């Protein structure tokens, strides 16, 4: 009621101050969900490292050369689909050798199975009072192998792979 009163009086500063206390402790607006780690397992120094962002196509690109092979990662996020896609390519067939893992700065568990990583957890605070999440990372590859261990997917001899990352939370 006090926030509404402040808004009707056009006292936006007071309304903003009051809304900070609505949900209580550990209910920050934005908390980190997960971190996708892609660790290149190839030999050699990185050269021609480049990052680009195209606002027109909503595409972020990272590229580098290592031992004469050009590697590229293209990142695309779709808000309607609640999905992030990352395409890994190389200028030489079967040149992608990397480890992909998930971690988070908030309480979580990670499980690897087949070509998929699943991370579950909850926002800071007591689990029974916090927002819970489940995110799935799935990889589609053309060739090579993907081997899961406890919490990592190992890609070996892959020419191209697309990583799909989706998320769902208990937030209403």
Question: Which residues does each PLM region occupy?
Answer:
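Aromatic-residue-lined binding/catalytic grooves and analogous aromatic/hydrophobic interfacial grooves
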Residues: 1-172
């Amino acid at each position: 009621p006090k926030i509404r009163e402040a808004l009707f009086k056009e006292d936006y500063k007071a309304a903003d101050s009051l809304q900070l206390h609505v949900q209580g402790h550990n209910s920050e607006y934005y908390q980190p969900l997960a971190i996708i780690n892609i660790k290149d397992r190839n030999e050699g120094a990185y050269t021609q490292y480049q990052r680009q962002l195209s606002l027109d196509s909503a595409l972020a690109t990272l590229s580098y050369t290592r031992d004469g092979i050009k590697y590229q990662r293209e990142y695309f996020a779709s808000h309607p689909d609640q999905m992030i896609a990352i395409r890994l390519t190389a200028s030489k067939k079967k040149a992608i050798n990397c480890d992909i893992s998930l971690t988070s700065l908030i309480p979580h568990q990670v499980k690897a199975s087949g070509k998929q990583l699943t991370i579950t957890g909850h926002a800071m605070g007591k689990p029974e009072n916090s927002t819970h999440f489940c995110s799935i990372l799935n990889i589609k590859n053309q060739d090579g192998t993907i081997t899961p261990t406890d919490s990592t997917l190992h890609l070996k001899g892959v020419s191209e792979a697309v990583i799909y990352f989706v998320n769902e939370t208990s937030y209403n």
